[in-house]
A protein has these predicted regions:
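Alpha-helix capping and helix-loop boundary segments enriched in small/acidic/polar residues
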Residues: 4, 8-9, 27, 31, ...
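Glycine- and acidic
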Residues: 100-110, 148-158, 182-190
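Glycine- (often His-adjacent) and acidic-residue-rich active-site loop
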Residues: 140-171
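Terminal presequence/propeptide segments associated with secretion/organelle targeting
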Residues: 92-94, 132-145
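Amphipathic alpha-helical segments at domain termini/boundaries
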Residues: 1-108, 147-148, 197-200
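Glycine-rich beta-to-alpha active-site loop
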Residues: 5, 10-11, 142, 170-200
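A short, well-ordered alpha-helical element
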Residues: 108-134
């Protein structure tokens, strides 16, 4: 493929691009809108039918200002005496909590793992947008390792439930946001930390 791109001045076009799996399909400009609509409908038909899903009510997450930063229910973000350093802490609850999909769905946005990662999102946005001078973020996950591993089991076993499925994808997006935040993140491990499973 590299040789083709290097040797062929016009690159790889049309049918050859489809044959080489570089694109899913090709379409003349005159049929573009119709083909996009057809492909979108076909992709939508392949998804599970969720017509009976009621959704959940999303509540605003309030934060408390502390002497050195901000605190939510499960996440704290402190700016500490060191210059350009922040301390990000995720605190696990004492137990995994509900494991039944129906009970979890009933909790909605109050399900602790969902709320924690929504709070993490707010902390990351604070760092990204409002704290440009911060260069180093010391990260801790505190709590029981069994809770960190247990919530992964719940997410995996309940993956067929629409809500748990959506929360799992939300967690992935937040972890990608964490990885792509232009700060240096260091995990601080020690007694009482719980870097395991999703939190590893």
């Amino acid at each position: 493929l590299c040789d083709a791109f290097s040797a062929v001045a016009e690159g790889v076009k049309g049918k050859r691009a489809v044959e080489w799996n570089l694109v899913d399909a090709i379409s003349p400009l005159s049929k573009w809108d119709d083909n996009v609509t057809e492909m979108s409908r076909r992709m939508a038909d392949e998804l599970p039918n969720r017509g009976d899903v009621k959704g959940i009510h999303m509540k605003t997450i309030e934060r408390n200002e502390t002497e050195n930063g901000f605190a939510w229910e499960y996440v704290t973000l402190n700016f500490g005496p060191e210059e350009r350093v922040a301390h990000l802490t995720l605190s696990l609850p004492s137990e995994v909590g509900a494991t039944d999909a129906a009970a979890i769905e009933a909790q909605g946005c109050d399900w602790w793992i969902f709320r924690m990662f929504r709070e993490l999102n707010l902390a990351l946005l604070e760092l990204r947008i409002l704290q440009p001078e911060i260069g180093l973020v010391m990260t801790r996950v505190v709590g029981d390792v069994s809770v960190a591993l247990g919530i992964d089991e719940v997410l995996e076993s309940g993956a067929e439930n629409w809500f748990i499925h959506e929360v799992s994808h939300f967690l992935k997006r937040m972890l990608k946001r964490y990885e792509n935040t232009a700060k240096s993140f260091y995990a601080v491990m020690g007694e009482g930390t719980a870097f395991a499973g999703t939190f590893y």
